[in-house]
Amino acid sequence: MKMKSKFSVFGAAVVSAFIGLTPLLASAGEVNVYSYRKPKLIDPMFEVFTEQTGIKVNSVFAKKGMLERLQSEGANSPADLVFTVDIGRLSDIQNAGLTQSVNSARFEENIPENYREPKGHWFGLTTRTRIIVTSKDRVKPGEITTYEQLTDPKWKGRICTRSGKHVYMVALTASMIAHHGEAEAKKWLAGLKSNLARKPQGNDRAQVKAIKEGVCDIAVINHYYMVKMLKDPEQVPWANSVNMVFPNQDGRGAHMNVSGMALTKHAPNRANAIKLMEFLASAQGQEMYVQKNGEYPVKAGVPLSPLQNFWGPFKEDSLSLAVVADNRAAAIRLADEVRYND
């Protein structure tokens, strides 16, 4: 009932926003994609896939309202595949009953088990890690090395983060629940809140800017925002003002998340969709993805970007993202209980 109520308020506006789009028609030589990722990132890969297979890829950029659109279209949806970012968005689509399972030996070969839904409802395509960044001027190298140390009282008034209920922060908190239990995770989140320099606000890049401006000394961000800032002349000084810390390298490793894909429940071009999924999980598809967006490949042995090679290898947390997804509701509740955003 809660989901229906939410859709009644928001869904009509979302659906109307798509009315002007040309319908995607099912075809034996096509595959239809709803994508959270921007066309400039994924279209080059689709073009190569089409050249190799003759299968045309029709894509719709749907950063907002993807789940609501799929719900409204129901069995008449032309969508075969969904591309999105964060385990939360993938699991939300699955939990809404909008995906179907896929069995493929190529996925088992190319995608580690912790980046796959156990029954094949979603698959990670690239990984991103949630790193700690610290002021080069005000924090000594090695002074903070773990997520747990973010609660140290010596950092009081010195940390910036985005909203505690944003999907990236929710996933991190969910991983803390998985590793430490809910009670300890709540203490951790409350301790982090007590060390904030300001009310949570802005995106990940805004936290790095705040360090450059002296608002805070430490922030928690997704690693690829460093790549994005280094490509923007205005933001290069922000990136150059911080050191990157891959957390928990002497323990479980850095928290990981994914961009991923899922086969829709009513996919009209199922066979073509699976071919595209397998291409994107292949060495060729993975390398194209990684070179475009600065994220890491899920497939082992794929060449990294020059910047990733400069950063060097790091230890990844091997926690299953399906477990992270299961703890998301509790993580959101904890953010409310500690009044993280207040």
Positions of predicted regions on the chain:
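Ligand-binding pocket segment of bilobal, Venus flytrap-like solute-binding proteins
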Residues: 168, 175, 179-247
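Extracellular/periplasmic bilobal clamshell ligand-binding domains
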Residues: 306-342
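Periplasmic solute-binding protein
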Residues: 87-98, 117-145, 173-174, 256-262
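Short beta-strand->loop
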Residues: 34-37, 99-108, 118-119, 122-123, 134-136, 142, 148, 218, ...
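A structural signal for short loop-to-beta-strand junctions that line the ligand-binding cleft
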Residues: 77-82, 100-132, 148, 158-161
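Mature extracytoplasmic/periplasmic domains
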Residues: 259-318
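Early extracytoplasmic/lumenal segment of secretory-pathway proteins
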Residues: 28-92
